[in-house]
């Protein structure tokens, strides 16, 4: 009697509740303040921070700490507990790890989402791949072997590639990028890219030149494998590299935290000119010294004196405050350079210097005149 009726009513209520929950599941379990699907070009804009340090702390961790190896800048600071350990090839692990963390974290989460959204096709995917390659060739130059070809979406860990494997994989991926950008360049400005592109405003022809210049840079980096490097260098130049000032790439974002890091940290005593570059430029009496550096006030006979990398004395900023600083003549809103056309010219000159007798001649040297 009544028990059966109650049982059936209860069962019906459960069924109705289950149906109701199922019907409204998306409504109840979706965050209304979070977009359900982020556009691929928006994801790409998040990756773009690897081209130029978006805040001064990144400039410290990446540009300043590693710059001693280029012979351009020395970071005589107490960041490393009183010693500039990068210059001793004995960087503290937490500072070394910062390079990995900042670069990998800015690349891979969005890169994998773009791969999925674009099905590995089109300009936005090509730009994501180009940005990944730009970041990873920098990592490989700093660290040697890196995880690259085996980095997959969803994996917590990835095996390291040895250097030949990583660099060849990057070249292969870059060739695919260049092919996509070359086709896209014939169609004019890409509007999806233009919406997020603070460098070239969606101009795929400029990005193609950028990609070829990156390829030329990478070829010079692997010049120890002579035949392979020469072939890649000549392919890059034939494909078209940066040639004019208008081709140079800058991050034009000047609001918020995206500011010129060197313009900020040079005023803190955190960086000084490196002795390598000032010594060369003094030797050649290079007229550009006054545009690059401030004059020293430490009592030396030369006007421009840099701080040596790997000094046996633990650096203290006050020890070097009167050495030549970087000449930053503008404020922190100056667009940050990413790649100059001048780099392509110097790379071509280096390519000619290293080229074998069977070179096709496309690398064309440049003339350098330092004046009297």
Task: Locate predicted features.
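Structured, solvent-exposed acidic/aromatic patches
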Residues: 38-41, 75-372
């Amino acid at each position: 009697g009544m028990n059966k009726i109650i049982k059936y009513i209860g069962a019906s209520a459960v069924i109705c509740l289950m149906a109701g929950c199922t019907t409204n599941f998306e409504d109840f379990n979706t965050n209304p303040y979070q977009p359900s699907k982020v556009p691929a070009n928006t994801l790409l804009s998040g990756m773009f921070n690897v081209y130029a340090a978006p805040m001064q702390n990144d400039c410290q961790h990446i540009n300043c700490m590693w710059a001693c190896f280029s012979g351009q800048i020395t970071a005589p600071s107490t960041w490393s507990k009183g010693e500039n350990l990068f210059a001793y090839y004995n960087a503290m692990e937490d500072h070394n790890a910062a390079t990995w963390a900042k670069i990998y974290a800015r690349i891979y989460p969005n890169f994998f989402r773009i791969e999925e959204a674009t099905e590995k096709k089109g300009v936005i995917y090509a730009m994501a791949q180009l940005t990944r390659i730009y970041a990873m060739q920098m990592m490989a130059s700093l660290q040697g072997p890196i995880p690259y070809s085996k980095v997959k979406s969803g994996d917590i860990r990835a095996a390291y590639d040895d250097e030949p494997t990583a660099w060849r994989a990057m070249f292969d991926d870059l060739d695919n990028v260049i092919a996509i950008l070359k086709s896209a360049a014939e169609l004019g400005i890409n509007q999806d890219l233009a919406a997020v592109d603070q460098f070239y405003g969606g101009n795929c022809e400029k990005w193609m030149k950028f990609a070829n210049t990156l390829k030329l840079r990478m070829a010079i980096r692997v010049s120890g494998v002579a035949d392979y490097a020469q072939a890649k260098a000549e392919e890059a130049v034939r494909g078209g590299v940066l040639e004019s000032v208008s081709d140079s790439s800058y991050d034009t974002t000047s609001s918020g935290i995206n500011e010129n890091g060197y313009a900020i940290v040079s005023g803190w005593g955190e960086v000084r000119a490196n002795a390598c570059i000032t010594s060369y430029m003094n030797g050649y009496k290079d007229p550009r010294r006054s545009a690059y550096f401030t004059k020293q006030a430490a009592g030396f006979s030369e006007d421009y004196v840099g701080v040596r990398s790997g000094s046996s004395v633990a650096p203290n900023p006050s020890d070097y405050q009167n050495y030549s600083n970087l000449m930053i003549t503008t404020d922190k809103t100056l667009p940050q350079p990413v790649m100059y056309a001048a780099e392509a010219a110097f790379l071509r000159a280096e390519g000619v210097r290293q080229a074998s007798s069977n070179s096709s001649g496309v690398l064309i040297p440049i003339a350098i005149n330092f004046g009297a």
